[in-house]
Amino acid sequence: MANQLILLKKDFFTDEQQAVTVADRYPQDVFAEHTHEFCELVMVWRGNGLHVLNERPYRITRGDLFYIRAEDKHSYTSVNDLVLQNIIYCPERLKLNVNWQAMIPGFQGAQWHPHWRLGSMGMNQARQVINQLEHESNGRDPLANEMAELLFGQLVMTLKRHRYATDDLPATSRETLLDKLITALANSLERPFALDAFCQQEQCSERVLRQQFRAQTGMTINQYLRQVRICHAQYLLQHSPLMISEISMQCGFEDSNYFSVVFTRETGMTPSQWRHLSNQSD
């Protein structure tokens, strides 16, 4: 694409030796589709927004983690108090003898799975390392770059230790109710979600959990689940031959007419229009 926005190294790194730095987004505003001359890790702390990565939409909120390669196209829209940090790095500048490919999905041809989640424990540990990394990356002493790279190595190992698939919180996890709830919602794309049954199983207050969820994400539980389902529907409309009625079932809508109403309200176009427009842009 001739007019593709490309973020340049010289606008983010202080010199050609610096391998890693941190870009805060407090908050992250709407940002047009772009690629980079560098790679990045995206860590979402709170709020919500629509993250479109290589034309696939993700409704993001606290705990979402993305591994972005230089060539990946992504954008942010529909943001609501979205707070995140980008840890940006140049693979060719890294000097530490670390098996980066084993730590970072997609690193220089490694198998790429871009979207993961961190629970509260992993987020707390990652935040501590990122704060130190940000301090060093802004430093001017002779060892600042080396210290920043050491901390980057610690960060990617911390993320690998604590990350989990969006719908698969480990059974042995000691994560919070909020982490368990978001995982349960990710597992409810095709079927109804019963919050009362979840709260009974976890022995918690439904009212308190609703309040906590809204405080951390900026959405109600139902709003979040609806947005996640619509994102999944957008992806299926673009990348699968399924009929719209089949897609509505796979996204938790038993009535395809109701699905069309909700989809149109959320995206501004009907499912058929979305599919047609997406096929035209391919």
Curated annotation (Swiss-Prot):
DNA-binding region(s) in UniProt: 196-217, 244-267
Claim: Membrane is one of the keywords in the record: no
Signal peptide: none
UniProt keyword annotations, A-Z: Activator, Cytoplasm, DNA-binding, Repeat, Rhamnose metabolism, Transcription, Transcription regulation
Cellular component GO terms, alphabetical: cytoplasm
Any GO MF annotation of the entry: sequence-specific DNA binding
Domain spans labelled HTH araC/xylS-type: 179-277
UniProt site (Interaction with sigma-70): E246
Superkingdom, natural source: Bacteria
Protein name according to UniProt: HTH-type transcriptional activator RhaR
Organism: Salmonella schwarzengrund (strain CVM19633)
Gene, per the UniProt record: rhaR
